[in-house]
Amino acid sequence: MTGKGQGFGFGLGKMKELADAFKKAQQVQEGAKRLQEELEQMEILGESGGGLVKVIVSGNQEPKRVEISPDALAEGAEVLSDLVTVAMKEAYNKSTATMRERMEELTSGLELPGF
């Protein structure tokens, strides 16, 4: 049994910490929503063959478009396939790196446990 005045062990300091944690969580949630909107609008370029093939994706890796130079068509199907694959990988890698950087910016300084 607890002594008089001890309650459940939640002093004002603990309540303030809890309130601060909720405030930080709300800030992260709002920031994440803005970040998601920004990532959707981004256009990140991956290219290959000196620009013969360009792949554009959003900041959250959604394909937006593929641009293929007429000169790339003359290279044949196998080479064209390789060029598209390389450009896609480059666009994807740039996009994931951008997303990671933006997420780190969002959560930096928040002192979240486990991050």
Curated annotation (Swiss-Prot):
| Annotated keywords | Cytoplasm, DNA-binding
Complex and partners: Homodimer.
Cellular component annotations (GO), alphabetically ordered? bacterial nucleoid; cytosol
Tell me which family the UniProt entry assigns to this protein: Belongs to the YbaB/EbfC family.
Instruction: Please state the span of the N-terminal signal peptide per the UniProt entry.
Output: none
What is this protein's record name?
A: Nucleoid-associated protein Npun_F0448
| Cellular localisation | Cytoplasm, Nucleoid
The organism named in the record is: Nostoc punctiforme (strain ATCC 29133 / PCC 73102)
Q: Does the keyword tRNA processing apply?
A: no
Instruction: Output the InterPro entries linked to this UniProt entry.
Output: YbaB-like_sf (IPR036894), YbaB/EbfC (IPR004401)
Q: What terms describe the molecular function in GO for this protein?
A: DNA binding
* Known function: Binds to DNA and alters its conformation. May be involved in regulation of gene expression, nucleoid organization and DNA protection.
